[in-house]
């Protein structure tokens, strides 16, 4: 039996069959305003039958990518974000075929860096699986040196995150 993700929203089964995998705006878990769905693949699990700790990083990457796709800031010409730091806390084990919803937000934006917060929940019981904070730095692809985040990208993030964004 499928259960709704959000009031009036599509079911978990419908969501994971394609229409919501790219992510979407949500008011389910403030201060998060965006989430992306995924499912635990067999290759994500370890010998204990649970998600191997390092496999959560691709879930965060998926959510972060879809967040920027939604904002229209997926690519910045001549620049790319690189990972500076990642801090992950594990709260409960996810298992093969569990549907997961990964919430993402930009919590801070600096001159050349941004901090992302994540919270991933198992569906449909809404059990918290993992939380994380990651810091990325924008670099020039030619020099591999940090460069300022463009004002247009900052404005898109600021408009979406509102007062929850630290600068």
Range-by-range predicted roles:
Residues 3-101, 107-115, 119-167:
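Terminal targeting signals and extreme-terminal segments of soluble enzymes
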């Amino acid at each position: 039996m499928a259960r709704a993700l959000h009031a009036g929203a599509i079911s978990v089964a419908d969501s994971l069959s394609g229409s919501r995998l790219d992510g979407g705006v949500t008011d389910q878990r403030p201060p998060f305003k965006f989430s992306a769905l995924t499912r635990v693949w067999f290759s994500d699990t370890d010998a204990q039958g649970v998600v191997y700790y390092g496999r959560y990083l691709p879930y965060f990457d998926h959510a972060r990518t879809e967040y920027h796709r939604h904002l229209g800031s997926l690519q910045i010409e001549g620049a790319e974000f690189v990972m500076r730091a990642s801090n992950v806390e594990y709260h409960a084990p996810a298992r093969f075929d569990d549907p997961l919803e990964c919430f993402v937000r930009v919590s801070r934006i600096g001159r050349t860096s941004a901090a992302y917060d994540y919270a991933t929940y198992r569906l449909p019981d809404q059990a918290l699986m993992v939380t994380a904070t990651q810091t990325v730095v924008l670099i020039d692809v030619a020099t591999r040196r940090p460069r300022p985040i463009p004002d247009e990208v900052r404005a898109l993030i600021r408009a979406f995150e509102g007062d929850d964004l630290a600068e």
